[in-house]
């Protein structure tokens, strides 16, 4: 039997207020005057969170419309715009929900891979690592911040760019960022996590390593959705 040697996120910081460390986290990843590009969920336009983003030099904030799942055309347009404006960038930082996470991962990959993102929809088709990328989720439960795929709607199909180059280099998990999320959105993405737990415990390809994650995640989901009759800060911590 052959076992898969799978890629995971390189660095993780977790805790309330962790977002405040973003500047020091990004500092060693900056390359000369090449900017950091912050892809931010359009929900946050005009909101206080934007003023906390640690901009330096040519850094740029781009508000991404993620009403619908990212499209390959959207990814290609953003990557081409950045190449034309800056040549290259120090990194792509995604701030938002699952669709924003996927968009940031895809744009990072397309900064260093030729053609269209549609060419890489599938399994292990990406040839080169992308530029540095960090994910900062503002919703819990999608799992997009830790997955090896980025789900895109292409010209002919909806499919992920699945590769070992896809996972983020860094994620910042700050439960405080989920506090102002709409209640229904919190519930939907939380149940997404709950269903992932069931899949990870009842699926076809199981092992004790993966089951240990599924069991603990299910326990935390049950604390949030079953044993409590109200939502509090601890719920945000547990779900993230």
Annotate each PLM feature.
Residues 88-105, 138-144:
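Glycine/serine-rich anion-binding loops at beta->alpha junctions
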Residues 11, 35-37, 61, 90-93, ...:
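Structural motif
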Residues 1-91:
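ATP/NTP phosphate-donor binding region
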Residues 112-208:
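A glycine/threonine-rich phosphate-anchoring loop and its flanking beta-alpha core
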Residues 200, 204-240:
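Active-site segments that bind and position negatively charged phosphate/pyrophosphate groups
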Residues 23, 76-79, 105-108, 191-199, ...:
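Predominant activation on well-ordered alpha-helical scaffold segments within soluble catalytic domains
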Residues 102-114:
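DPxDG-like acidic metal-binding loop motif
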């Amino acid at each position: 039997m052959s076992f898969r040697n799978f890629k995971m996120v390189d660095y993780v910081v977790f805790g309330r207020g962790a977002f405040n460390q973003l500047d020091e986290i990004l500092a060693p990843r900056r390359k000369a005057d090449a900017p950091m590009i912050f892809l931010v969920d359009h929900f946050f336009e005009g909101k206080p969170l934007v003023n906390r983003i640690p901009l330096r030099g040519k850094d740029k904030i781009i508000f991404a419309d993620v009403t619908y799942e990212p499209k390959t055309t959207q990814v290609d347009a953003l990557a081409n715009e950045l190449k034309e404006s800056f040549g290259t960038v120090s990194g792509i930082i995604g701030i938002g929900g699952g669709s924003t996470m996927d968009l940031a991962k895809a744009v990072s990959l397309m900064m260093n891979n030729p053609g269209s993102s549609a060419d890489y929809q599938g399994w292990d088709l990406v040839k080169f690592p992308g530029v540095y990328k960090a994910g900062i989720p503002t919703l819990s439960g999608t799992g997009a911040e830790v997955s090896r795929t980025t789900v895109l709607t292409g010209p002919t199909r909806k499919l992920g760019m699945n590769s070992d180059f896809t996972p983020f280099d860094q994620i910042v998990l700050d439960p405080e960022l989920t506090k102002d999320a709409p209640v229904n959105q919190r519930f939907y993405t939380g149940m997404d996590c709950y269903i992932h737990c069931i899949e990870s415990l009842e699926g076809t390809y199981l092992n004790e390593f993966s089951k240990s994650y599924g069991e603990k995640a299910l326990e935390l989901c049950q604390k949030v959705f079953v044993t409590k009759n109200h939502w509090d800060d601890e719920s945000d911590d547990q779900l993230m």
